[in-house]
Amino acid sequence: MTFDYDLFVIGAGSGGLAASKRAASYGAKVAIAENDLVGGTCVIRGCVPKKLMVYGSHFPALFEDAAGYGWQVGKAELNWEHFITSIDKEVRRLSQLHISFLEKAGVELISGRATLVDNHTVEVGERKFTADKILIAVGGRPIKPELPGMEYGITSNEIFHLKTQPKHIAIIGSGYIGTEFAGIMRGLGSQVTQITRGDKILKGFDEDIRTEIQEGMTNHGIRIIPKNVVTAIEQVPEGLKISLSGEDQEPIIADVFLVATGRVPNVDGLGLENAGVDVVDSSIEGPGYSTMNAIAVNEYSQTSQPNIYAVGDVTDRLNLTPVAIGEGRAFADSEFGNNRREFSHETIATAVFSNPQASTVGLTEAEARAKLGDDAVTIYRTRFRPMYHSFTGKQERIMMKLVVDTKTDKVLGAHMVGENAAEIIQGVAIAVKMGATKKDFDATVGIHPSSAEEFVTMR
């Protein structure tokens, strides 16, 4: 049987782009379908615009810090329209850049929403295409709980397009998305209230990270309301009235309500049932992400239909952009490059671009103790005020932590809260991934004076 394409990719996000270009480099005839801007969640409504907002949110604090170093800085004022417009322009520039990369790689871009007709046929609009192999890389989307007035809430998709800066933003959700935007909006000058079901934010992260970030956020003026859930949202003359579950908790009045309670795989209307593609049982809990309708795959990203594959957030393995890229490239290498290989999901570094920032790689203390036993784990921890703040008058702190296997001396995890955490942990992650021991860390000469040197001087 002959096909229109060797590979048809549904979704031009990080995973789909990486897989399509890699497959084309091996000589495969490849098409990719996208019904939005090319680039996916990361480029269009995730990592990239969010990080630009993070950068923008740092300037008020920098202006304050400058005074401690003798600089005289005038009154700072944010031009919100300029800020948001600049972010949108950069997003669109990057989207066009990815289109040019596809053209250079020889991948055909088809605009429109793709659905599966059967295991070898995809329909886009009124056109049908056949392919030997199909890759699903449609990512995920935010989900809102079903509560009265939830239509007044926005998600992380819409926050990048607010016409005016909120005076007061209320955020429901204490995962990395809600926590990051709490820091961003507070840094930009908005009043921020974050509502969390548990007693702490960032469930699943190391306990010291959770404690340190929550304390730092509170010190920065963010109001965190623990052990509460939103019960209703109502539009009132003053803005949005947000009712909470706590008996003694007064309703919150805010002008913007951000819903950051989770994401789900974006498979609605994809036609999985037409192609015999199975999904994961929704009773299985994923890592901070709903597994409802996540596509089930094996170690080679192969679905229940042997010629159909899936990568990225739609599979709910580890929902990070570099992971989707790695999965996509591993798939292409295996199926078109004569290099069958798995993508390892072990020991992957990640960051929370909150304020204060956090980054982590490897096992948390709780995970290590559960795996090896309480007596088999040694913890090294330090907490200090960085030199930068010698003149600022601020009580900012950095926390660093190593989780070590007592018997083998192997470093199982590294965690950090504080300025430049992501940049520092990226380097530390190489050592942890390679199996470095605490003795290896101790034998490394630190760069002085730096915050990073504390990772090799902890005793």
From Swiss-Prot:
Disulfide bonds: C42-C47
Enzyme class: oxidoreductase
Superkingdom of source: Bacteria
InterPro entries, per database record: FAD/NAD-bd_sf, FAD/NAD-binding_dom, FAD/NAD-linked_Rdtase_dimer_sf, GSHR, GSHR/TRXR-like, Pyr_nuc-diS_OxRdtase, Pyr_nucl-diS_OxRdtase_dimer, Pyr_OxRdtase_I_AS
Entry EC no(s): 1.8.1.7
Binding-site list for NADP(+): I177, E180, R197, K203, G262, A351
UniProt: glutathione binding residues: S14, R329
Cofactor descriptive note: Binds 1 FAD per subunit.
Cell location: Cytoplasm
Job description of the protein: Catalyzes the reduction of glutathione disulfide (GSSG) to reduced glutathione (GSH). Constitutes the major mechanism to maintain a high GSH:GSSG ratio in the cytosol.
Protein name: Glutathione reductase
Organism whose genome encodes this protein: Nostoc sp. (strain PCC 7120 / SAG 25.82 / UTEX 2576)
Gene symbol of the encoding locus: gor
